[in-house]
């Protein structure tokens, strides 16, 4: 049985309107007491005054929702007050004094899940929508809110359940029904491969959600920090004519064509005896290993140098874009690289061409990532365990093991899928998911 909770659902601060929710068995009684409304129609907006202990609190709009037709599945009230901090707090205080308690983080959405209004995947999608920092992330999360991933998981469940039912029929009628092990092997092999592809696409999906890591590398004074500042549209890095100014890794975030990128500016790579600069260079080399795409910045006024050759050896085999910078100052180079881009980080010349090149370089990540609807690490880890159980079932079938061993593998895979969508769950799991939400959601 749920108790009655309340919280401000809109962001803290001053605005035109604030939203306060009350959920639970006492919610309607509390609202009627504060408004003086007795007979109400559900899901209709009323404009009235809130009164408490003889004082007018605010003129508000209020909506009554009747269980189960609400966000939570319980009796629910939404009050729209004027958006001042004080007036909002006064209204909330009156609600709490009238019999509600303050809601915990994500408790409204958690109640919706527990009442079957949404799946666990949809609950996670709501959080991802709120936290989305790029158009691509938002679109993926909205697809999950519509139930896209849930449909895919139900398909996996259905295939496994079909095989299990075939196996269990042979347990009940061993002399009458012969199991078609070849057909089951083909089906499970196909399903295992589908889950494997989903996992690979999902890792790219999470990469898109978290931001594709783009590392800027180059020799000292090639204009890396100027390029970082130009891409970020702010002076994040110190820019001077003195080589080796950047000693540490500097990070920022941008969006290009709806794709989120985490940009990493690194210390200039060269041979040096300076102890501090050496540490910065070591960190630069580590960032190169983490990069999804590398901007290899070269100086058009000096051409391709020994230092550039040293850096090229470090990044060869990686997903890099050769970027000739300072093209407004010099043209001291011949075409050396395929796909090289000419820019001036100082005045922005060629920047659009560079952005287009960056997007094309990560095209595979974008296409695979947006094809997947898995957007959390929890979901990926569960699918990896599902894959392991399916792989075990296929191997056991191939080696001619008893069919009841295959049944155990499939039941374990099924349990994992149930955990993914929330058919089965633990209190710790729910606390871990919903504690990330804000109070009021």
Curated annotation (Swiss-Prot):
K(+) binds at residues 221, 240, 242, 245. GO terms for molecular function: GTP binding; GTPase activity; metal ion binding. (6S)-5-formyl-5,6,7,8-tetrahydrofolate binds at residues 21, 78, 117, 441. Its main location: cytoplasm. It is an enzyme of class 3 (hydrolase). Its cofactor is K(+). It is found in: Cytoplasm. Exhibits a very high intrinsic GTPase hydrolysis rate. Involved in the addition of a carboxymethylaminomethyl (cmnm) group at the wobble position (U34) of certain tRNAs, forming tRNA-cmnm(5)s(2)U34. Belongs to the TRAFAC class TrmE-Era-EngA-EngB-Septin-like GTPase superfamily. TrmE GTPase family. This is tRNA modification GTPase MnmE. It comes from Thermosipho melanesiensis (strain DSM 12029 / CIP 104789 / BI429). The gene is mnmE.
